[in-house]
UniProtKB/Swiss-Prot annotation:
GO terms for molecular function: RNA binding; zinc ion binding. Residues 621-715 are annotated as: Type DYW motif. PPR repeats lie at residues 38-68, 69-103, 104-138, 139-172, 206-240, 241-275, 276-306, 307-341, 342-376, 377-407, 408-442, 443-473, 479-509. GO terms for biological process: RNA modification. Keywords: Repeat. Residues 590-620 are annotated as: Type E(+) motif. It comes from Arabidopsis thaliana. This is Putative pentatricopeptide repeat-containing protein At3g23330. Belongs to the PPR family. PCMP-H subfamily. Pfam families: DYW_deaminase (PF14432), E_motif (PF20431), PPR (PF01535), PPR_2 (PF13041).
Amino acid sequence: MSSSKALIKTLIKNPTRIKSKSQAKQLHAQFIRTQSLSHTSASIVISIYTNLKLLHEALLLFKTLKSPPVLAWKSVIRCFTDQSLFSKALASFVEMRASGRCPDHNVFPSVLKSCTMMMDLRFGESVHGFIVRLGMDCDLYTGNALMNMYAKLLGMGSKISVGNVFDEMPQRTSNSGDEDVKAETCIMPFGIDSVRRVFEVMPRKDVVSYNTIIAGYAQSGMYEDALRMVREMGTTDLKPDSFTLSSVLPIFSEYVDVIKGKEIHGYVIRKGIDSDVYIGSSLVDMYAKSARIEDSERVFSRLYCRDGISWNSLVAGYVQNGRYNEALRLFRQMVTAKVKPGAVAFSSVIPACAHLATLHLGKQLHGYVLRGGFGSNIFIASALVDMYSKCGNIKAARKIFDRMNVLDEVSWTAIIMGHALHGHGHEAVSLFEEMKRQGVKPNQVAFVAVLTACSHVGLVDEAWGYFNSMTKVYGLNQELEHYAAVADLLGRAGKLEEAYNFISKMCVEPTGSVWSTLLSSCSVHKNLELAEKVAEKIFTVDSENMGAYVLMCNMYASNGRWKEMAKLRLRMRKKGLRKKPACSWIEMKNKTHGFVSGDRSHPSMDKINEFLKAVMEQMEKEGYVADTSGVLHDVDEEHKRELLFGHSERLAVAFGIINTEPGTTIRVTKNIRICTDCHVAIKFISKITEREIIVRDNSRFHHFNRGNCSCGDYW
């Protein structure tokens, strides 16, 4: 018996000496054999079972106790919580209270965590009140659990201030509770003030303490405060670790301060921690956001161990820097390397398909998303809506949108902009109004979308209403994109002088891109006099605006003013400017075929020319007359018609038709504005071939069908 008592005393001091299920069962059996299984010893065995996550064995023994001690209750409640059985943990707490047992400070952290995970703020507040009545609100771990609960559930009706919880916690040390609790608290922007207050009164601080406050400041956008804490840390004997540096590096990418970032990179190399995956991912992200993608690639290539975060960082970096093909290539390598793509990876790579207008790759990614179980992720679903819209399949985009269970301003904006770019202006406006009725507050991007929609269908009065409501109703500042959309609207409506005055009186300095919207309208309405004034405005603020030079050359050519055009082209040559080659591409059998205006190198060029000659005869019979006014060469009319014949969009459309079954929709993408003559020609081709032809240029989608275009001949 004395040996059993000695064993009990030893286990009371250190029950974690039992490391396996067999050892725990042997101890349990020994207590039974020696008839020493009292409530105290049973509670110890229950504690050991729960430490080993043997919930079934713990509950069997627990149920044999007529009046379980607090230690037994604590062990069972904690085990329920650790195994995510939160409702059972709370039910056990209620049962414990009903039994007359008074919980000690070891019980409350598990109970409060269960309240947090169940999102049961009301129950949590009642527990908080009970804690205060017992005088246990000063316990360090209980206070941390309270902070975590309020940080996560604040804003759901709580009348208790998070700061007050800390006011009642006089005990503070560098080991101030569970690290998960600290991490969860510090990332909440509204919790950073409370974190700071705790940090300031801590008598001793360690690296974890500094990491918590630095990460909190950084993730709350309080970069100067984060850097101040790094400098303060440098005055102590503490040294930054990988978590410190991975928190600080993103700050420099936000500041675009790559010099300081490289200094930290040097420190990392000297300390021999450059292979750390967290630091590596942060370095990749920092260099990418600083437009130094080659440095990102070098850091990535030197990582011995690459996790999903490091892969995602470089994929996102490629997309941020407009290197969409590289992003898709790296994503394929990621999948080949057996790294399972997560939500972040899909959210990064899907926009690459949108920018490249590669529908077949977008569909493949959509399949990956569904197989990976991410179909309900709001960020991925919104990216898919945007991708299908920009790849010319607005029906698929709308189908995904209509199936989304949760909609935010991003998903609403994606579908509104999609309909706007496809010429469905009235539908886009209707969706914008529905978004407001659903209680979703439009942001600045949403207003760009609805103003674009109004512009494409000529809703002048509605556009003015939306533009003015930004500041008066929603407190949003109008930015350059909003002014450009209104200027474009006025120009499309033929109100060129009003558009000129509107831009001249902008609250912010108009850029070349804003003036360029009006220049395009001058070209459409053939107002050369105003176009010259607008062009000079553009060249003043953006002397290398290639689009403005090309538009003015087109206008001079169409008016037969070859001398002025020659002067402008000489001006371009002196500046070293060259017209961007007109390129169009089309996907065919999972392969992208590209065409450049005037290029005859494509293997199918003979068949393309044969088709175009045949269809041209039918077009001319139905009234087609080539519009050669935009040809920038002083040559005879026959030569001009030959030049138009080789435009890239026409070649791509012809290639699509001769390589698909009758009735198949043709989708073509062009890098610049579709030319006037090709626009007319493709309308005829759509009628003759009975095809729907969708052309995406650099401003919108043109849906050609039965001889008409969705843009109403205004783009």
